Amino acid sequence: MAAAASESLSSGGPGAVRLPRLPPLKVLAGQLRRHAEGGPGAWRLSRAAVGRAPLELVAVWMQGTVLAAEGGQARLRDSSGAFSVRGLERVPRGRPCLLPGKYVMVMGVVQACSPEPCLQAVKMTDLSDNPVHESMWELEVEDLHRNIP
């Protein structure tokens, strides 16, 4: 039954996103911009530089500061660069978080990686209340990628 649920389409009509079956991979915007290969529905993160096989990018987890938001889209920045998120009008957000300066987590499906990453949002959460989230994010991502075989 869980498999059937994970294969369903999210509600929202046109542009609905197929919900991922794998947990999201924590990434930085710069990693997607420099090391992503493939295309929509078949993105991979190259790890050839460290002698490892690429990672499938079904869904990603990114964090960043909101630079601008309008009409269900937002532009964010993490420590490695800017990225865009769309489809925000259809995702659960909890507290209002689409305000410039807010630090947020976005889980989404990669739509593009160049010239800058763009995600179709599945979930968004405001992390602004605890500055540790922002200060530790780059280290969390680095640690994860160092330990994935």
Swiss-Prot record:
DNA-binding residues: 46-116
Molecular function GO terms recorded: DNA binding
Matching Gene3D superfamilies: Nucleic acid-binding proteins
Residues recorded with modification Phosphoserine: S8
Primary location recorded for the protein, binned into one broad class: nucleus
Recorded superkingdom: Eukaryota
Subcellular location: Nucleus
GO BP terms in the entry: DNA replication; double-strand break repair via homologous recombination; regulation of sister chromatid segregation; resolution of DNA recombination intermediates
Record's keyword terms, sorted: DNA replication, DNA-binding, Nucleus, Phosphoprotein
InterPro entries in alphabetical order: NA-bd_OB-fold, RMI2
Annotated Gene Ontology cellular component terms: cytosol; nuclear speck; nucleus; RecQ family helicase-topoisomerase III complex
Keyword hit for DNA-binding: yes
Post-translational modification: Phosphorylated during mitosis.
Secretion signal span: none
Role noted for this protein: Essential component of the RMI complex, a complex that plays an important role in the processing of homologous recombination intermediates. It is required to regulate sister chromatid segregation and to limit DNA crossover. Essential for the stability, localization, and function of BLM, TOP3A, and complexes containing BLM. In the RMI complex, it is required to target BLM to chromatin and stress-induced nuclear foci and mitotic phosphorylation of BLM.
Subunit details: Component of the RMI complex, containing at least TOP3A, RMI1 and RMI2. The RMI complex interacts with BLM.
UniProt family annotation: Belongs to the RMI2 family.
Name under which the protein is recorded: RecQ-mediated genome instability protein 2
